[in-house]
Amino acid sequence: ALRQHLLRLQQYTKKDMIYLARGGFWSTAPFIFSSVLSIALVWAFANLLPKDIYGTYKFVMTLSGSLSFLTLTGINIAVTQAAARGYEGVLPYALKIQLRWNVLFTIAMFGVAGYYFIHNNALIGTAVCILAVTFPLTTSFNTYGAYLFGKKQFRQIAGYQIFTSFFYIAAMVSILAVTDNLLFIITVYALGSLTPLLFFYYRTLQLSGEQSQFLAEQKAQFLNYLKHLSVMNIFSTLSQYVDKIVEIRREIVNRDK
């Protein structure tokens, strides 16, 4: 019955409504799954972690997010577009330029860590160093999802994202259940996020078969679009995090008085 309704609607929209319905379902399923699992993570943070440790955790994560504009934030959209155009070699090329460019983020984060070490706050300094190394890798290897989206592999993306969410949340709830050590928690956060992305990135490459050459003209189009998107994202990223940093920093200062 649903198929008949979609076919009837297709006569008016002139679009493949069955395809759109399938894509919509597989796009929504990971969001619903991760939202349900996130309830367990929220509960764990609220009940298993002291407020002062949680406040410091939020501060470190917000610091990392505020500098994320130094990564190529527009690359996933650019990769999706390139994959949709049939540029098969875009995935390894995108990883390569991200690993190079994201060094800026690592340098900036080490600078922030140095500030905290100088001011005798080794805890935050060490936590920032952990994210300085792992966050750029996470943002680089998650590009496989954008590639699969451009190739319209919605079911495959959904399966990968659901497993990734489960792996990360299970790891976080487990570490929160056994310790309130901030550095252990940050490390598990980093590895819990990165590990499944590494696996699914290389699996995507393997299943995609031999990658065709990414031609110079294709690279030029890709890079121009990528630069435009990334520059546009700088201001939105800064505006999103500046107020949060000030607010959380104020909470920490007031707590330590």
Task: Locate each region found by the language model.
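Interhelical loop/hinge segments that connect adjacent transmembrane helices in multipass membrane
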Residues: 2-16, 20, 155, 159, ...
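Transmembrane-helix boundary and interhelical linker motifs in polytopic inner-membrane proteins
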Residues: 13-18, 49-53, 67-100, 149-155
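Membrane-interface helix-loop junctions in multi-pass transport and translocation proteins
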Residues: 46-54, 115-126, 151-155, 166-197, ...
